[in-house]
UniProtKB/Swiss-Prot annotation:
RuBisCO catalyzes two reactions: the carboxylation of D-ribulose 1,5-bisphosphate, the primary event in carbon dioxide fixation, as well as the oxidative fragmentation of the pentose substrate. Both reactions occur simultaneously and in competition at the same active site. Although the small subunit is not catalytic it is essential for maximal activity. The gene is RBCS3. Induction: Accumulates to low levels when grown under continuous white light. GO terms for cellular component: chloroplast. This is Ribulose bisphosphate carboxylase small subunit, chloroplastic 3.
Length: 177
């Protein structure tokens, strides 16, 4: 058996020989110019790159007092038309709208130092996911109903992709005053 394996290996090596002699190495990604050995010293500080003077209009989010909630929390509260546009985007991507509500609109820990089920990551779902929903007005009507039932709670809209089994978008639809 060992002699038959050696014979088949020798035949395979003999066949591979002529094919390799006709192959040419691939050089398309190589540069013909070598890398520079030294860098040019830039002692002139007036030529440093800038952002066109836009720094003066940037602000820093204050770390105390203003909580960030979800994806669009840095914007002013969304109007009904803005919510409808977001829900239309959600529906165009074939995501299932879900409405959730919670007393606290952010992650918090009151029972233990390590993360757990009751630390604000999981919100209560309002009714069932809206499978088969094709109109943003249906989702807006459910948000209004949730606001009426729980006026002191946060309400958020989630877009769930049931093909990939992931949550793709989440934003606050209502903040209590």
């Amino acid at each position: 058996m060992a002699s038959s394996m050696m014979a088949s290996t020798a035949a395979a090596v003999a066949r591979a020989g002529p094919a390799q002699s006709s192959m040419v190495p691939f050089n398309a990604c190589r540069s013909s110019v070598p890398f520079p050995a030294t860098r040019k010293a830039n002692n002139n500080l007036s030529t440093l790159p800038g952002n066109g003077g836009r720094v003066s209009c940037m602000q820093v989010w204050p770390p105390e007092g203003l909580k960030k909630f979800e994806t669009l929390s840095y914007l002013p509260p969304l109007s009904v038309e803005d919510l409808a546009k977001e829900v239309d985007y959600l529906l165009r991507n074939d995501w299932v709208p879900c409405i959730e509500f919670s007393k606290e609109g952010f992650v918090y820990r009151e029972n233990h130092a390590s993360p757990g089920y009751y630390d604000g990551r999981y919100w209560t779902m309002w009714k069932l996911p809206m499978f088969g929903c094709t109109d943003a007005s249906q989702v807006i009507a459910e948000v209004e109903e949730a606001k009426k039932a729980y006026p002191e709670y946060f309400v958020r809209i989630i877009g769930f992709d049931n093909k990939r089994q992931v949550q793709c978008i989440s934003f606050i639809a209502y903040k209590p005053t």
